[in-house]
Amino acid sequence: MFLVLASASVALAAAAPIHSADISHASQAYRADYRTESTIRFRQVESRFANRASLPVCRWQAELVVNRAVAAQGRAVAAVAKPIHRFAPLAGSHAGSCDAARSQISAEVARYSDARAAEATAVAQQDRAVLLNELDGIHALSVKG
């Protein structure tokens, strides 16, 4: 028996932020935007037997992450932009090729993301204190005295 593997990865980001916060810190105005991003990894496996036709199976795993992006005066502050929460991964398999199952898998991941929307928003709202601590650390390093 031989296995034929094909892998692919797709990232799906939410267009609008799930939460935004305006923060004033050390006489600087910051804008923090929080978005969810889904990444789906596909792996197509075909078992091949000498006397039978191959049977493709699409195995997939999706990860849902809440990302923070921060800007000051319209410029991104890369030092504090990062993923702040990862949800438990979602995985499954579909009979057939990954190309044929892609729309079904994307719909399942979208339902998973919608079901976690309230939790993602709550995580983003609770991040304010963490972000302020990170900005304090950056400010302490940049203050000359």
Please report, for each region that a protein language model flagged, where it lies by residue:
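Sec-dependent N-terminal signal peptides
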Residues: 1-12
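N-terminal secretory signal peptides
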Residues: 12-78
